[in-house]
Amino acid sequence: MPKPWVVFGLGTLVLFLWRLNKIGRRPKNYPPGPPTLPLIGNLHLMPKKNAHLQFQRWAEEYGPVYSLMLGTKVAIVLSSDVAVKDLLDKRSSIYSGRPELYMGQEIMSGGNRPLFMGINSVWRRVRKLAHGLLNVKVSRTYVPYQDLESRDMLMGLLESPKDFLNHIRRYTTSLTTQMAFGYRTPSSDDKGLLEMFENFDELSRLTGSQSAAILDLYPIARILPDFLLPARRLGREYYEREKKLFMKHFLNARQQLNSGTSKPCCAIDLLRAQKEYGFSDEFGCYLSGSLLQAGSETTAIILTGFFQAMLVFPEVSKEAQEEIDRVCGDRLPDLNDYPNLPYIRACLKESLRWMPATALGVPHAVIQDDSYLGYHIPKDAGLILNVWAIHNDSKRHPDPRRYNPARWAGDNQNSAQAAVNPDPTKRDHFVFGAGRRLCQGMHIADRSLFLAISRTLWAFDLKRPVDKETGHEIIPDVDNIKDGLFISPMPFAADIVPRSESRAAAVRQEWENVAGLLDDDMQWKTVPEGLKWKDYEPLDDENEDLLESLS
């Protein structure tokens, strides 16, 4: 007769093997998905590049709600506007968590990056602070920054048009540094600006890497030393470098506040709130710096996509310029023209749809068991917002890879209004997320995009370059996309020329009109009240309340 310890050992081994055999397999009541392998599930199918295209193909094969088994974890992929509304919006109280993002949050952010925070008391405090910093009323303080930086971008395009990609990123990054810390990045070769570029590129690359995925999905791998995990070592170095940068600017803002020379920015508002909320300088500096960081890069990518689309679909720029000339004539467009430029607003919407930057979003997590469409969704499952698939659904948007602003004719919603529309089919895009994770600064991004698009087309023609050897026009490859947490067009060439000598002279004059407000270091002397254009957009208290209820 076998000894009891032998029976116990065999039983334990059988149980272990049985449970091991279950890892990676899809339970019958889960949403459908690709075939799995034991232990790894669908990990062997995860694409090394162009993940957004594979996720779109799976949506076409398995439907608007499908699952991916990722080792010991599961991801539910939402690929329809209705599913996003039903779960992330209507059930936001349980669908607003974040899966554990070990590399992105713990290693590269010290736990302080709002974008990656899970639901806890710190995140709730951050959301309350962020609403106070970025709500519709407060964000009007930043309109002078948007006006000045868009004029500076025009000057850059006039003086060095071949460097247009850097002028775009300087525009959006300088807006971010002003709104975050109150200082400008006046040159596309500014050391601080280049450091911001490099930091965000590295954040996107490392958090979207296979090494990060392994550490997220298999926590046991975290016990390995850094020399076996070079990505984690780079992540630690990144965090120390970024924290040092943010702290320098945060302490400088404190010095300006104490001396009475501060400019409107998030850091100043946080410093004023620091005593009430009791947070540390490290937390404050990181919140100031990272709160708007993702929005800056998103805006730059959308604008880059717009420039590319104008080369591929030149008929759009012609129609847009006809509208601008009809409404503005020889006057530089401003935010007061927003209601009278419906085709430009349509270009804004189409740019957000066509090159969405966050093609797969930042994943949510459900905090308790739930069911949807007869499927079981387990607690802690990740929820992926399949933005690319929704934006390129031919039933929702016929001929989706064609840049066609006419598809938005009659749609007068801004991004915030569309996001809270009870009819999900009326939502224009999903770039800014959903539910309680909806970006609170989307109205700032809409304004930045409107000014950049309308003013660029007023001043310049965007033309295809010509190959000197063949004489043929060079058309950018719209499928040549840089991968990572954020996707963007790979660098491409363009010929950007003033529409006339008078428009070129007007660009110079418009810059001179505001350059006198800057000191010798090209920083603001004072922020002028007269540039706020308080009449261009009535405050929409109803939609503000709806956004607040979601967030």
Swiss-Prot record:
Record's signal peptide: 1-25
Documented EC number(s): 1.-.-.-
Protein name in UniProt: Cytochrome P450 monooxygenase virE
Annotated keywords: Glycoprotein, Heme, Iron, Metal-binding, Monooxygenase, Oxidoreductase, Signal
Family that this chain belongs to: Belongs to the cytochrome P450 family.
Broadest EC class assigned to this enzyme: oxidoreductase
InterPro entries recorded: Cyt_P450, Cyt_P450_E_grp-I, Cyt_P450_sf, Cytochrome_P450_fung
Names of the cofactor(s): heme
GO molecular function (one): iron ion binding
Role noted for this protein: Cytochrome P450 monooxygenase; part of the gene cluster that mediates the biosynthesis of virensols and trichoxide, fungal natural products that contain or are derived from a salicylaldehyde core. The pathway begins with the synthesis of the reduced chain in virensol C by the highly reducing polyketide synthase virA via condensation of one acetate and 8 malonate units. VirA has interesting programming rules since the first 2 ketides are fully reduced, the 3 following ketides undergo beta-dehydration, and the last 3 ketides are only reduced to beta-hydroxys to yield the trihydroxy portion.
Species the sequence originates in: Hypocrea virens (strain Gv29-8 / FGSC 10586)
Residue positions the entry lists as glycosylated: 392
Binding-site list for heme: 439
SUPFAM superfamilies found in the cross-reference section: Cytochrome P450
Pfam family, one: p450
Pathway linked to the protein: Secondary metabolite biosynthesis
